[in-house]
Amino acid sequence: MASSTLSHVTPSQLCSSKSGVSSVSQALLVKPMKINGHGMGKDKRMKAKCMAASIPADDRVPDMEKRNLMNLLLLGALALPTGGMLVPYATFFAPPGSGGGSSGTIAKDANGNDVVVTEWLKTHSPGTRTLTQGLKGDPTYLVVENDGTLATYGINAVCTHLGCVVPWNTAENKFICPCHGSQYNNQGKVVRGPAPLSLALAHADIDDGKVVFVPWVETDFRTGDSPWWA
């Protein structure tokens, strides 16, 4: 009997109060008529329209402007903790400062201060490799030799595969890229791919007590080849 009564409900009456279907919950109870096993597509479409029309305006999906605002607020919330973690590394990606003349750049430490050799060697033990800001603002390792002196070269930390910054792994005594596993020995020579080339070099000269990076254009002492970066 119920199915017979519902079969006389027309699409135009579906959302009408006269038909007794005036809410979303009531509309969901109305089943489409079936003829030879096939549902009435028109009734289904009308039910969807009725459901959408019955939802209060405040409960509907927000318009594009509101969604964009919510996205911005979400990104801002995520950026707060992330930004704090990136502060120590920010100076390595900042534009290089002035100094060192047209052919060289004074090395900067993680706080953006000039690297003074005597002070640096007091706080960095033999065998350490520490990031500084080098030529063109690139992150560049300063190397303290095993005898406690500063190496005459700096090692560019940008991986030659896809440009990730390669950290120094003290336990393994090599540079290991976290992105795709490329490895370089303690002088930056590539020993395992997918990186195709060794890390670039720069001269680490001393001028007025400060470390100055100068472009390396001579033969790469690690490979005996011309420098690919020059």
UniProtKB/Swiss-Prot annotation:
Rieske domain sequence ranges: 117-213
Pfam families given in the database record: Rieske, TM_PetC
Residue positions binding [2Fe-2S] cluster: C159, H161, C177, H180
Transmembrane stretches, start-end: 73-93
Record: transit peptide: 1-25
Disulfide bridges in this chain: C164-C179
EC nos: 7.1.1.6
Gene3D superfamilies recorded: Rieske [2Fe-2S] iron-sulphur domain, Single helix bin
SUPFAM superfamilies found in the cross-reference section: ISP domain
Enzyme category, top tier: translocase
CDD domains to which the protein is assigned, alphabetical: Rieske_cytochrome_b6f
PANTHER family, alphabetized: CYTOCHROME B-C1 COMPLEX SUBUNIT RIESKE, MITOCHONDRIAL
Subunit structure: The 4 large subunits of the cytochrome b6-f complex are cytochrome b6, subunit IV (17 kDa polypeptide, petD), cytochrome f and the Rieske protein, while the 4 small subunits are petG, petL, petM and petN. The complex functions as a dimer.
Family: Belongs to the Rieske iron-sulfur protein family.
Identification of the protein by name: Cytochrome b6-f complex iron-sulfur subunit, chloroplastic
Source organism of this protein record: Solanum tuberosum
Lineage: Eukaryota, Viridiplantae, Streptophyta, Embryophyta, Tracheophyta
